[in-house]
């Protein structure tokens, strides 16, 4: 949603100090009118900036500074497909911005393969390896770039944990009670 009114209602309903609640904001909201300003005013809650940054290394590096200092996310996503240099530049920028602002560095999470994609989609884009092999390769790049973790479907968690143990945190967006027809997740599991 891009509705600040709707987001404010959700936050008000979850402000109880008994709850450990975090809020995930994606491109749609953070790029909406006043979206980043609104998020920067949320205090004492965990912010997950799910922006999936993917651009040339210097552009991503420069984009990280204001995100870290203004939005102050606990977690921030980048596409591993941007390459090791882009990821390393992001780690550098997040570390520097955090030090200069005396704030905690966000966890930088690399997106492996979008959970809306399946093997057929990858083949249509010219990829010659499976999703599983792609996630394996991407998780190795994330580790080399010193990311804090990765984002993958729940179907690949065991693979990543077997490869990297607890070195990389693993975030899984594809958890659904059941398949919904208006949901764009292709690779998901039920709890």
Regions found by a protein language model. Give the residues of each.
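Conserved alpha/beta-domain cores
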Residues: 1-43, 47, 51, 57-65, ...
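Conserved anion-binding
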Residues: 59-148, 153-158, 163-167, 171, ...
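Short glycine/threonine-rich catalytic loop with a Thr-x-Gly-x-Asp
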Residues: 182-188
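Basic, amphipathic alpha-helical patches used to engage nucleic acids or provide basic targeting signals
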Residues: 191
């Amino acid at each position: 949603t891009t509705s600040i009114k709707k987001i404010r209602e959700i936050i008000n309903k979850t402000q109880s100090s008994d709850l450990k609640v975090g809020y995930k904001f994606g491109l749609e909201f953070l790029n909406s009118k006043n979206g980043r300003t609104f998020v920067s005013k949320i205090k004492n809650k965990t912010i997950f900036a799910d922006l999936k940054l993917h651009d040339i290394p210097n552009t991503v590096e420069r984009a990280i500074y204001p995100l870290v200092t203004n939005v102050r996310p606990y977690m921030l996503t980048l596409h591993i497909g941007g390459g090791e240099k882009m990821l390393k530049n992001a780690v550098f920028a997040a570390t520097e911005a955090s030090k200069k602002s005396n704030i905690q560095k966000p966890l930088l999470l690399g997106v492996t393969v979008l959970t809306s994609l399946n093997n057929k989609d990858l083949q249509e884009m010219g990829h010659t390896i499976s999703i599983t092999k792609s996630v394996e390769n991407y998780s190795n790049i994330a580790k080399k770039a010193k990311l804090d973790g990765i984002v993958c479907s729940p179907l690949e968690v065991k693979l990543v944990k077997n490869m990297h143990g607890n070195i990389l945190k693993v975030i899984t967006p594809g958890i659904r009670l059941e398949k919904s027809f208006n949901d764009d997740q292709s690779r998901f599991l039920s709890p």
